Amino acid sequence: MTQVSHIGSSHFNINSSIKTALPLINSQYNSLVNESTISSNINLPFRLDAPSLFNGLPEEWGPTDAELSTHSNVNYPGLTEATIDYKFCSTLNSYFDTNQRFGNVPNDTYLMANSMAANIENNSWHNSRYYFDGNHPLSQWLPVPVNCWSNNNYIRDDFYDKSIQEEEFKSRSVLQTNEKNSTNVSSDINHYKPLITDENENLKMTKPTHNLLNNDSINLCRFPQNEIIMPDLINAPSPTLTNNNLFYSCGDHRSGKTEDLPSSDDLEQFAKMFKQRRIKLGYTQADVGLALGTLYGNVFSQTTICRFEALQLSFKNMCKLRPLLQKWLHEADSSSESPTNFDKISAQSRKRKKRTSIEANVKSILESSFMKLSKPSAQDISSLAEKLSLEKEVVRVWFCNRRQKEKRITPSFDVNEQFDNEVSSTMPYSTLNDDRNEKTIKNSFENHEKLIKQTGETNHEQNNNSSVKRLKIRKEPDQISINDENTSCRAESSGIVPDTHYRQECDNHSICGYNIHDIHESSVLMSDPVSFYPRSFFMKNNIYSNGTTPTLFDHSQMI
């Protein structure tokens, strides 16, 4: 809060807690102070809406109505015409001079007033609060008391009409008008009331009085008459709740009018109807997006049309896209009856090929052909297509899709290419001949030696010798029962036993063709523990007992 100390009949000094509240030049401060003439201190509130002071002030800012008649000619302590030294004030330059602007300002100068207003009245209570020239460029940015905004009251007209007239003072606002404020302004309007033209028609565009503002900058903003209006965050329009969905009105907040927006139910029904009509007319989502761009200049992607039909767009975007789709749907319906240019435009987009449905008996023939030969040649495809009365492309695509399906349902194993060639489509786990078995075992030992070298094991020879003793594989002529004393398993060419899915399938169907027996219990496991299991492991976990189905075992339980 700014305080003014009355120093004498010719000089005054201003002490302020705000640096921009008009301190004098420091070099002249000591010469102006006269302690013997200092009287009481008074407060100097400065309102941002200074021109509205002519409508009246709150009662706490001055004497009551009864006191005005008896004290109108009494000089209250403060800044009056008698206490102003115009010669001294004329030597003080304004901080924001129109010619000087922001340059060459002394370091010890913050803000200086040129002089008092020429037509200021001898009313010290009023003058002590409003003594700035209306042309001062910072008149709207001076300190403001807290109660100016907290009491939510405008300056009343009925107070100052008795003593102060608006025409006798210069307007302190940057925006000036010759019209008076309306006296029938509601008292419940606060300073945060939004500018709504329909409610207050008397608030008009005003003309600038300061050369810092030009016509172009004025056109970019709207000010009410001699007021700075803040947004009304408290009384802002509340969102409307429609069908359990929260949507905000998209109307103009200045005019106070809102558009008639569809509800969420309307959008949902339209999206459902649009999708049905589009499919019935034979157009894809990409066709609609391309047609909108060709007809109306707004190109939309297939994803946008898809999200509209699925109600995955925002409410605002759904409202914008709906009229365009309505126009397109109307054109599409009319073109179905009478061919127009719309058909030519729609024909430019790529048509989706119809989905081919294959009968059950034809599909069974294709399945049997696939089991015999999964990758038929072009000649085989042509002959099969002619036999089944299908297009060649349909048969080719079916075999491609069937091979992809086979990859998904059949587990892939890390085996040698030679072993892969021996696997048939119906029995992927076929047996090998004796020569192939010997080669497989030899490859397993070679891989074992390489792994030991990589890990830097010192007992390389010991493990290699024990590996020869631990495994003896022989081919069984007949299927092996799960109750067999020895454990049934299969050795792959890579030396790695298949995963648990294969082991379960192998045990359930008894198709395994190899038997692991005579395993040295004290032998050291190979570097790949999944490849071979000691006999004690199977006995300990009771994997094969009493003719029950073997359980899937965890590799981490191995000893």
From Swiss-Prot:
Residues 259-333 form the POU-specific domain. CDD domains: homeodomain. It is found in: Nucleus. One of its GO terms (molecular function) is RNA polymerase II cis-regulatory region sequence-specific DNA binding. The keyword Nucleotide-binding does not apply. Gene3D superfamilies: Homeodomain-like, lambda repressor-like DNA-binding domains. Residues 351-410 bind DNA. PROSITE patterns: HOMEOBOX_1 (PS00027), HOMEOBOX_2 (PS50071), POU_1 (PS00035), POU_2 (PS00465), POU_3 (PS51179). Keywords: DNA-binding, Homeobox, Nucleus. GO terms for cellular component: nucleus. The keyword DNA-binding applies. Belongs to the POU transcription factor family. PANTHER family: POU DOMAIN, POU DOMAIN PROTEIN 2, ISOFORM B-RELATED. This is POU domain protein 1. It comes from Dugesia japonica (Planarian). The lineage of its organism: Eukaryota, Metazoa, Spiralia, Lophotrochozoa, Platyhelminthes. The gene is POU1.
